[in-house]
Amino acid sequence: MFKPHVTVACVVHAEGKFLVVEETINGKALWNQPAGHLEADETLVEAAARELWEETGISAQPQHFIRMHQWIAPDKTPFLRFLFAIELEQICPTQPHDSDIDCCRWVSAEEILQASNLRSPLVAESIRCYQSGQRYPLEMIGDFNWPFTKGVI
């Protein structure tokens, strides 16, 4: 049975810069957007806000849905990655709460698009989607019978 990993990611933008998180994987420092897996007891928007806080210490809510990417990683792991936009008025300090995150950096779009240390090609693709102006209302992602507590009828 096909069971893709459901993940969320945040393109965080302030004052012309984008926020990336840096983590060391197999001895290499890699950049990613604040991102992670959906948990069973949360909506996609809640997951995005949680991952942002865990990985950067920033408490903010996504303002827009950008895109859903269906992707097969090089190790053949399937993903459905839901991408959200978060616009901040100004660059703010970061304090990761997730021990897997080494640091956070505010960088330009060009630095991301030209970087050789991206965790996946989706990091650059997410910036391209953001730059293209793709934005959809959060209501596009509906919660049905949420929270799910009554069982199947």
UniProtKB/Swiss-Prot annotation:
Query: Domain Nudix hydrolase spans what residues?
Result: 3-131
EC top class, as a word: hydrolase
Q: Which domain of life is it from?
A: Bacteria
Q: Which InterPro entries match?
A: Nudix_hydrolase, NUDIX_hydrolase-like_dom_sf, NUDIX_hydrolase_CS, NUDIX_hydrolase_dom, NudJ
Keywords in alphabetical order, please.
Answer: Hydrolase, Magnesium
Q: What positions belong to coiled-coil segments? A: none
Plastid in keyword set: no
Example of a GO MF term:
nucleoside diphosphate phosphatase activity
Gene3D superfamilies documented for this protein: Nucleoside Triphosphate Pyrophosphohydrolase (3.90.79.10)
**Cofactor or coenzyme needed:** Mg(2+)
EC code(s) of this entry:
3.6.1.-
Q: Where is this motif: Nudix box?
A: 36-57
Q: Which family does it belong to?
A: Belongs to the Nudix hydrolase family. NudJ subfamily.
**How is this protein organized at the quaternary level?**
Monomer.
Protein name in the entry = Phosphatase NudJ
**Which organism does this sequence originate in?**
Escherichia coli O1:K1 / APEC
Identify the coding gene: nudJ
